Amino acid sequence: MYDMSRAMGHGVGDGKDRYTTADRRAVLRYLNVQRWKDAANGTFVPGGHDIYVDDKGNVSAADRILPETLPANPNPVLKEFFDYYRMPRGFHPRSVNSTGAWNATMPLSFMNMPLLSYASEVTIPTLIVTGEKAHSRYFAEDAFKAIGSKEKALVIVPGANHVDLYDNVAGKIPFATFAQFFKTNLK
């Protein structure tokens, strides 16, 4: 699972948040400048939700979520998403992840709205699933800790990455585990 407000507000790292406080401020400045440019131009610039800050505080963002072609020696997470969204397995011509990007300033809507703020108020049975090798695993583990329900389960799927759990191409989705959780908790 992804906590999208955390992902946009703190950057997605490999098992932890990526932005420092200075990085976060730089991203906010960048997005606010872009918002003014968009207003002045009467149109918006496309962009993804993952914004990069280098060691000197310079901010850069791509004009699309995934590249047209995969670069040599890609980051494993980029390859994972590319192999799903840009290939027949998950491609759709109207999918933002497959072919384009959102409005570049879209992260502003998420950055100051922590989605899990009220997770402790969730008292219904809750099943959270993540892959053992998912770069996003920390989102699921933290969400599980925050959920207020006594009837909750965190399923960490052995050997699975984030995208393995989109469909069952890799044969890793534990449907029997899900069925048992639902039989036990949905009455």
Q: Which stretches of residues belong to each language-model region?
A:
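Short, conserved loop/helix-junction motifs that constitute active-site signature segments
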Residues: 119-123, 146-150
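Conserved beta-strand scaffold positions in the cores of enzyme catalytic domains, especially
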Residues: 154-156
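Alpha/beta-hydrolase-fold enzymes
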Residues: 1-82
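Conserved alpha/beta-hydrolase "acid-adjacent" motif
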Residues: 110-114, 130-141
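Flexible internal linker/loop segments at domain or repeat junctions
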Residues: 83-105
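Short beta-strand/loop motif that positions the catalytic acidic residue
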Residues: 122, 128-130
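Active-site nucleophile elbow and catalytic-triad environment of alpha/beta-hydrolase enzymes
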Residues: 100-118, 124
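Catalytic active-site module of serine/aspartate enzymes centered on a nucleophile-bearing elbow/loop
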Residues: 158-187
